[in-house]
Amino acid sequence: MPLPLPSRSSKPETKKSRSSKIVPSGNNGQSEKRGENYQEKISSSSPRRLCKKRSAFEDLTNASQSQPAQLKKEANKEFVKDVPKKIKGNTPALGLAKSNEVNMVSYKLESSPGVVSTTLVPNITEKPLILERSTTSGTITTEEASFFRKPLILKEESTTEDTGLIKRSLFLKKFTNKGEISLMEKPTSVQEEADSNDEFVVKLITFGKKHKTEEVAITKGTLSLKKMCTYQEDLALQDITVEENSFFMEPTNFRKKPKTDDVTPTKKMLSLKKKKYITLGKVSRMKKPLVLQKTNSEDESPLIKEPLAFKKKPTKKETTFTLRPLSLKKYTTQGKMAHLKKPLESQNTSGEKALIKEPLSFKKKPITKEESLFQEFSASQEKHTTDREVVLLKKPQVLQEEKDSKDKFLMEPMFLRKKCTTKETNPTKKPLPIKKKCTIQGKMYYLKKPLVLQKTTPGEESFVKEPLSFKKNTTELSMLQEKYTTQEEVSVLKKALTLQKTLTEEESHLKEPLAFKKKHTTEEATPTKKLSSLKRKRFTAQGKRSCLMKPLVLQTSSGEKTHIKEPLSFKKRSAIEESFFKESPVLQEKHTMQGEVALLEKPGALQENVSSEDEFLMEPISFRKTHTTNEVVSTKEPLSLKKKKCTTQITMSICQELLDLQNIISKDKASFFMEPVSLREKSLAEEVILTKTPLSLKKKEITQGKIFLLKKPLVSEKTTSEEESLFKKLLPFNKKSTTEGEFLFQDPSVLQEKHTTPQEVSLSTKPLTLPEKTTTEEEPYIKEPLTLEERPTTKEEFLSQEPFSLHAKPTNEDESLFWKALGLQKTQTKEDSLKKLLTLQEKNTTDEESLLNKPSILKEELSTKVATSIEKELSLKKKPTAQGEVFLLKKQLALQENITNEESLIKQPLAFLKPSIEEAILRESLALQEKPRSEEETLFKEPLSFQEKPTLNEAFHFKEIISLNEKHSTGKELSLKEPLALQENPTQKEDTSLEDSLILQVETSSRVPSTPPESRAGMSSVGKLSTTSKSSVCESSSNKPSSSWGESSQKEMTPLEDIDRNHGDPFFNSIYAKDIFSYMKEREEKFILKEYMNKQTDISSCMRAILVDWLVEVQMTFEMSHETLYLAVKLVDHYLMEVICKRDKLQLLGSTAFLIAAKFEEPCPPCVDDFLYICDDIYQRHEMLSMEISILQTLKFDINIPIAYHFLRRYARCLHASMKTLTLSRFICEMTLQEYDYVQERASKLAAGSFLLALYMMKLRYWVPALEYYSGYKTSDLHPLVKQLNILLTLRPSNKLKTVYSKYSHQVFFEATKIPPLDMLKLEEILNYC
């Protein structure tokens, strides 16, 4: 007969008063309201207990720490009492999530609440959509304004004061080299102030807007600054007064001193000191930076889109948004350094509050005049210069730099404005994204600014050359980014080296702009600066080879001492116009003859850096050419020539471009520089091709120690007179392709070279994949140097290696024969590849995406071979990485990224025209950019897997690169990349968890290329997924195409514990989670239930079902956890399997088992009287206690029985399943509790079957491979169980026991019962398909 349910109306008052302490009402605030049907059973007179209870819905929060607003809506309804107190504790987090602007402004982990609120897909998707609207609208919405204003103002100051920031950074780096961190510390304190001074940042924007009327007065102050520089700049400033001065207005008004002359440079210095100081040292704040990166990366793509829209509108916000994404990307590129954002904010805020104070103390003398400030700067720089001899140059440089920097930057916005006002919106668009890149590192503005200054003097010609200046900036950006990436990856040595690099590079950058002005002022300084920049770049390019760098530095110092003599000496060495270029080959020849491969590597590294930076310059050039239709026509040829020049050497390109500008600006002085100009025109344009090839060769040489001697003599010989003649032959071909074909022709090379830049790994996804591959591939390269040499011959090498073979002849007959063979091989392949590329390029000239697609098309053609080779090599290295060599790999990767990546990565891009590994790598990066295609994903998954094994460092690099890919991609690609970036950057706490999902995506891509629309809706929310949430909106990450799991999945998915990082539940401790669940699966074998109902004489399976239905009601009444319910049912079954139970004791057994389970699971379990009461007092206290003893003795006190609920939570967390999917699986699993037929199923298998059916019902089949991996069960093994479960759901309406059904029909449980079960025929199709 059915068990009696408690009827409280019949209870006497005495019992009511006796048990008044037990009422499960929400005295503790756990549930304010109760269902009516339960109040009938447990009236107000029911016992009141003061203990804390977890609700049935508590586990929902276990899967995801926060509940959406639906919980609030249902607060007054029947089952809200089931919502645990944890959810209520998280409601403020939800509120925070709603006010995203507050969280984003604070840049604290509070941004994660916004992420936490992603349990409901609609709510979260709305927020990201709002963010995108606001960003694209061109107006800063109230939500984003607070978040954007900080970076915007950062960049606004940087726009007006970018040069100042650059100066400061130079300053800082000089100080940091000497260890004078005292100056740095002040900025840090200022930064701390700035963290709390978010409002200040907001005020800056308002100031800038309010005081546009006052801009003229301030511009006059700036004009006074510029008077010190040139009168032309003053005129230009007057032209710009309205818009450009708005940038000045903000800092000046905030300073509350119209003397922007003095205050701004000091602020710049201080803020840059902060930058430097923070970027160098404070990696300890990794967690916050990660979150910051998440927020940044989430907003980067929309921000990038904004500048495109804003470019059309030449308002002040154009530069601000453009600058902001730059800063964001800078931080993402720097990965661990991401907390730079706060420093940057502090640079604005503190830079505007406390920086005034510090500059005043620092500048007490020169308050009235900036010259004195500049002199102080020069003096400080003299103190801290790495080279004593450089001091002579630095003083005038610093003076001119700081004079120029402000003026130059002002001038540059002038042109931007002019472009905006004039019809040249297209050119403005490109400069703006390029500015973004430049703003990523304010240091780069030196080139822009001098270029712009010189542009202003001639007039309209500046428009044509403006992209050139941007190109230079981008190259330097790449340099700087390389520095930062190397600093992140490399240990203390790298930091020191990078400091040196940054010092030298900054000096070189300073000197280059100084060279601009010195060219205007004095003619002698320019050649020395060029040389110094060349040598410094050598110095910087060598990076980790500090020992080798020193001799180069000595050369630079000597070069700086003898301003004119040094270039003359170079010319003497080369005896040809190619003197600058040949200097490195001459040195190489010397070193090669000596066999000092290390010294040879230096020039190689120099050229590599040169090529990497210059090549990066080349990319913006190509982009601008494609977009700036008006200007490009005039500039395409010189740009292409300059691209080639840049690829040869940055110094060459800089000198050449400077000479061009000089020729345009000062024709009087042109005579002095005419020789370098001619050099450029003749040898550089021609030699560039060779220089690229020697670079590739040198890169090869560095990886291949023995071949250095061969290649380097070849390089030196290449630089000889034969190069010119051969190049002249090649020049017409190159010139033909320059307008259209060569842009794209170089664009692939640009792409290649981008990726070749080892330090620019942050800028290109390819380098990250490549560095890892290069580590894997270095071995085969070293093993097969000759084959590699033959491979990496890109088109450029094809052009150059024919002359190579010709050049090689004079060196050695053997080498000449060797190179001839190589040349023949390469020429055969090169012609085909060149034709293909040219055709592809000509077709896709207008689109930036075409530039990416071209290599992708080529790669697709050549991918099969490459894929196999990559897989083999990756497999080779996957083994050692998994074996604990991850540290070694990371170190090697860092080193290789600076050294071998510069070399081998350049190799690979060069080789990527041929069917080489780079093609697959580019394909992989493109796969990320374009959304992984089934073909590209197959190749891409392997680099992902490789990255996953090194886990943290490589994961960071990978994610940074993904975010940086957005920089290189157009707005369309950004729209595609945003979900990826959102997923990958914010999950840096869950580094490998996302990578796991990515691997799932990649490997499962072949069958289902497209994602369901519902999954796309949640994409943005996935980007905000909090690591603390037990389950996140996993439909959002359903951009993962589905297919076979793949053989390598087992290897790739090793770092499971990262999924559990920062998880509050002890079951999901990141260190122990994997071991815990593997142990639970082992324990399952000890608790396998057998059929016991046959030997039970007095009870049946129907009575058991009634008991379980009643236990579900008890669990809801006492608001206890689901774990308690599942464990109680397990205890009952195990007891019944051992002991024959009477019918009248069955309810006692159930209540006692629930008591034991509550003691085991609940923090505040109900007391015995509570259970006696719910049993309607039909049992006595001693009976329950004796039953408790009996159960424990029967089970031998081993009651830690694995339950299906734990496994459900685990699967949901591993798959990042949404709450709706998880709740559906819980409903299915809880339905099985009543059914005796499922008693024999293992808990883990039952959970896997329930979750699999839920995935099928939610149309999320592409997660099935992931479930297979994490559960350990094959879908084929689960299919019979899935069919049974689907039948159970289909027949549930006819079931008389409705408690579970009614429980999950509530909105708190997402109305899981309303989701229809699958049709049996459809299920059969699904199962057969799988």
UniProtKB/Swiss-Prot annotation:
Its main location: nucleus. PROSITE patterns: CYCLINS (PS00292). It holds the Pfam family Cyclin_C. Residues 1026-1048 have a biased composition (Low complexity). GO terms for cellular component: cyclin-dependent protein kinase holoenzyme complex; cytoplasm; nucleus. SUPFAM superfamilies: Cyclin-like (SSF47954). The keyword Cell division applies. Residues 20-30 have a biased composition (Polar residues). SMART domains: CYCLIN (SM00385), Cyclin_C (SM01332). GO terms for biological process: cell division; G1/S transition of mitotic cell cycle; meiotic cell cycle. It is found in: Nucleus. Interacts with CDK2 kinase. Cyclins are positive regulatory subunits of the cyclin-dependent kinases (CDKs), and thereby play an essential role in the control of the cell cycle, notably via their destruction during cell division. Its tissue specificity suggest that it may be required during early meiotic prophase I. This is G2/mitotic-specific cyclin-B3. The gene is CCNB3.
